[in-house]
């Protein structure tokens, strides 16, 4: 089970006890925000893409949307999201629980600047009913992200 892989991974950092599991689904931004009790923008949604360099996870704020022009400028190609089957095959996490943790070595992770507005954010932990509260610094470390990128739009910078 994917959440167990994430839990084992978090043990290395002493964070395994911080995973929250819910009776209800947290598979979408709205459901996760309700389960956690925060505004949707504070949910760190993980989107999976296939690039010429291989699979990639891009983590954005819950209110952010991919800006195709910015994406192409940063990554040099059009955004191509993974199908649910490919997301599971490449990341080990099913859609609804995709997260930037406990990933195969070939999966690159990038964090969008839309997350930096908040002192803490809530990414999933490998299942459709889990989350963890992390600072952006913790998210950067635990996700082993390669860099911060600016590839989103439609987010409210005043939140």
Where are the language model's segments positioned?
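Extended, low-hydrophobicity, polar/charged segments
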Residues: 1-159
